[in-house]
């Protein structure tokens, strides 16, 4: 990830422009993130870890995906002076939207996530499972969300699917080895709707 700079992204400009969704995260150099964001139809930005990135790049995200701590830091990068945003995910969500973010998802671990944007606001609860290993859960969430957005799903529906994926991921050891099948995700989602 550390080698994906602006030059590398420019070399793939056609692929980025043609992609339905482009995903970046904080382990990519800031100039590479900025170049990808500006060329993408839809830019999903997982600001993890939080890095020094141009505030306008954060505002291009649709959605910005962060945890509670990262949400507070992102709000500060965007100019917020509101204290204790890391303690109130709903307040952090609204603050990030007020600061110009297109849409925001704040992941809450075993509590699911909150999501807000032009489609509205929602709190997505996670099913209760015995957590065995949380490694890879955030990546699973972001990947599943991006895939659902690329399939044309709404942000809120994408978050419901991604929350189910992350929930199942923590129930097994390992990172990629713990990622569930679509069938497993649909089974847990049917249980939520019952």
Map each language-model feature to its residues:
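Structured loop/turn residues at beta-strand edges in well-structured enzyme cores
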Residues: 14-17, 59, 99
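Intrinsic disorder/low-complexity segments enriched in polar/small residues
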Residues: 13, 18, 26, 193-194
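Conserved phosphate-binding/catalytic region of the ribokinase-like
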Residues: 51-52, 76-194
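Conserved beta-alpha-beta core of the PfkB/ribokinase-like small-molecule kinase fold
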Residues: 3-4, 8-9, 19-91, 111-113
